[in-house]
């Protein structure tokens, strides 16, 4: 499911040549959230952080895609022994942006509270897909979840996306690894700008202006 949109050049038939816009095809029935019949678009790399022994380590994440056929974003990176893929739909992205906005407002007003992150004190909790594996993300769950929290480290507040361990939907008796992805306020603002729907649509429109014209 993770890699279904990759390496499939020619597998979707588009009738939009000459129209100036990408028209929905039969694939729209497969993905109700269909945006355009266009291959995944690589987004600008962003920086996040992992936490190890209470020390933050910067992650430069360049495998970052928008998939117009499903209106999902896919984020690939390594975490420990695992190669991970995190998949977010539009509702989850909007929830992250809303949570990030609240976090930044409270950070600027110095009103954030130093408390252990839990689902109860999360800014937002939502659904996602998580795939993982040693070499490639071969195992996965389409029923994953995440929580957007604040966590203080060395006296400073950071925004953290927490992904609880979840039973895989691709195999039995296998659970996803618990994962956390941290952001400083500056890193968070850039990430949220990347995942805003209007900015993703602008990417699609730019590709369509070159691909679906006579």
Located regions from the model:
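Positively charged, low-complexity terminal tracts
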Residues: 2-214
